[in-house]
Amino acid sequence: MQGGREKAFAVGVNCPHGSGVTADPNDRPRIRAVLLGGSGLLGGALRQVWAARPEIELVPLSRAELNLTQPDRIEAALEGLEFDLLVNAAAYTRVDDAETAGGRELAMTVNGEAAGRLAVCAAARGAKLLHFSTDYVFDGRKDSPYTETDPTNPLGAYGESKRVGEERVLEASGRHLVVRLSWLCGPARPAFPEWVLAQAAARPEVRVVSDKLACPTWAPDVAERLLPLVAGPTEACGLLHFCHPPGCSWLEWGQRILDVATASGVELQTRRLTPVAIADLHGMAAPRPAYSVMDTGRFAAISGRAAADWTEWLPQMAGKV
């Protein structure tokens, strides 16, 4: 979906009353939400943050109960469950493996076909779907932050599968919400911060890419900031970007994490990362956008609060909080 077709689904065009529906908070009952992918990095954050909140009752489903690799069984798996919100935090995320024949097919099944089935099932019940996507739907040829109205043009199979999922979700209902995230990290699962700390502790030299720019995203803050938009007085719909500005390279992000760790007394073999161009790295089969910084202005306008700078989350990312 490129160019003009995408704009039919952007910025909440299909959302009732535009970008969001505001209701009297006193009239809004506690909602029941079914969560997929609750054992993952994002799903774990959603479970942790939402579990104690009075406005939502969270019902996690395991992969054994609903397997996205079997889209034709999704409707039966949801049969008999009552819910107001379906949250899809599950995905095929093996970016490089998606370039193989089997990986490409699996990515499209999970990220594309299954996402569409979930969207249709939720819409048929009058429920909302909260679905997550990625900055990898862009080709990286811009030199300013991508907005929700910018056309997509994924470079690899993973990004293409996520783009297809976005399209199918937004076609199914104007109430559904797709949130694009980038460089996700959090306490539920190891990600880049844990990798760079482990490498710096074990090796005298650690090479990190310096010519790819995006924005880190702290998963618990995603959960905290999204809850009012799906279970609060303002219901967000359509397409949203959420990440922590400003844009940075993996090198800059990793170096700042090491700086925090060093200041906290963590023993490291190297305290200074070595820059490397992404083209010089081996083992990356999938092309990646060189620039995929996303603009979060629409999120700020709907929620009433801008996303925090990623440096504010450095102590948590470095495991010091």
Predicted segments — roles?
Residues 71-112:
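NAD(P)H-binding glycine-rich loop region in Rossmannoid oxidoreductase-like domains
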Residues 225, 232-284:
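Mid/C-terminal beta-alpha module of Rossmann-like enzyme folds, strongest
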